[in-house]
């Protein structure tokens, strides 16, 4: 990649000043991610309760973190409750995406019912991490879903929830009442929610024979440590993204970046790849064990997703979830496989 003084003023390209600031920004973002680690798992759990798949939850988390970094860079006052701040950003991001899609109309209403502030303890709390709860939650309209999760799972007060969702405590009470009533009614229905109600959004590539064949070819190239073969499976304009940390575009960047880091001679680990199906999608799991360590155990350390090119058996985008500990844990753990997580940043 050409940078700096190779370009005269006013010509296309990256100036020295831009290159230097990009390095500073990249390190600042990594420091920011590390600073948020204490609350990240809780914020991911909140995103997961709103979304139908692990992939959608991580997308929402990453968009939330990106917006949080931009907002933090413009704040002069301290952030008094980091988790609540991130939950507010995540909620607004999620609701905005629904509004843009035209799938839902979002209005607050205040009921005339005199509802208690907290109500009786709800059995939702004991089921907070169960997939059955997530399915039931998807029966609720967006704002009711957010209110139920924030109150019954995360134990925020009505005033705190009202602040996060930019509404009134009375409207939160009303949404909680309606949402809890819907969930209790659903629990009494032995048939449970219909698959149509809780199914994730369309994923055209999932389960498609051509998509699985592409993943198997890519996994075979990984296992052969054949970087030339790996690169040949990408579009010329293809992308490789280490989610939350790095993006590479084009054969040259992809070869020099993630592929050489993982499969080059200086890598500290030995890798092996397998193809699996999880949460509606065919994926690649990357296994690793330490090089030159006799008897070292092999564990899943990464989850990879491929977006195929339109009309061609090539990779348009490859996502590595190496620095997404919640995704690695949910996917590998859900498949009953040993795994390790890797923090949230290179440094």
Region roles according to the model:
Residues 25, 62-82, 100-102:
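Sigma70-family region 2
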Residues 170, 176-272:
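Solvent-exposed, charged amphipathic helical/linker segments at domain boundaries
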Residues 45, 59-66, 80-92:
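Structural recognition of an alpha-helix C-terminal capping motif at a helix-to-coil junction
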Residues 87-109, 185:
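Arg/Lys-rich amphipathic alpha helix in sigma70-family domain 2
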Residues 154-171:
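Helix-turn-helix DNA-binding module
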Residues 9-45, 55-58:
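A short, charge-rich alpha-helical start-of-domain segment used by transcription regulators
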Residues 104-126, 196-200:
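Internal acidic/polar
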Residues 147-148:
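A short pre-motif secondary-structure segment
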């Amino acid at each position: 990649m050409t940078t700096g003084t190779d370009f005269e003023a006013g010509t296309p390209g990256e100036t020295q000043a831009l290159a230097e600031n990009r390095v500073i920004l990249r390190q600042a973002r990594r420091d920011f991610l590390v600073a948020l680690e204490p609350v990240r798992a809780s914020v991911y759990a909140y995103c997961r309760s709103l979304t139908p798949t692990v992939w959608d939850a991580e997308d929402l988390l990453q968009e939330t973190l990106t917006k949080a970094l931009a907002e933090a860079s413009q704040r002069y006052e301290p952030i008094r409750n980091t988790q609540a701040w991130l939950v507010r950003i995540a909620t607004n991001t999620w609701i905005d995406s629904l509004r843009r899609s035209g799938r839902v109309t979002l209005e607050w209403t205040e009921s005339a019912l005199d509802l208690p502030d907290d109500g009786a303890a709800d059995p939702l709390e004991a089921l907070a991490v169960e997939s059955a709860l997530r399915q039931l939650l998807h029966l609720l309209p967006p704002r009711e879903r957010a209110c139920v999760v924030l109150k019954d799972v995360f134990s925020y007060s009505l005033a705190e929830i009202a602040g996060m969702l930019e509404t009134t405590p009375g409207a939160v009470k009303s949404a909680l009442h309606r949402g809890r009533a819907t969930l209790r009614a659903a629990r009494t229905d032995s048939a449970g929610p219909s698959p149509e109600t809780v199914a994730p959004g369309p994923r055209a590539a999932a389960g498609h024979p051509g998509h699985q064949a592409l993943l198997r070819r890519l996994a075979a190239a990984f296992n052969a440590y054949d970087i030339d073969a790996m690169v040949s499976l990408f579009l010329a304009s293809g992308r490789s993204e280490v989610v939350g940390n790095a993006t590479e575009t084009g054969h040259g960047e992809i070869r020099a970046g993630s592929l050489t880091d993982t499969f080059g001679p200086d890598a500290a680990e030995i890798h092996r790849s397998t193809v699996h199906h999880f949460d509606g999608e065919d994926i690649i799991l990357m296994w690793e064990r330490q090089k030159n360590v006799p008897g070292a155990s092999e564990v899943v350390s990464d989850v990879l997703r491929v977006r195929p090119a339109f009309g061609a058996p090539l990779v348009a985008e490859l996502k590595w979830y190496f620095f997404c500990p919640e995704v690695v844990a949910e996917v590998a753990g859900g498949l009953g496989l040993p795994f390790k997580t890797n923090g949230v940043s290179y440094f």
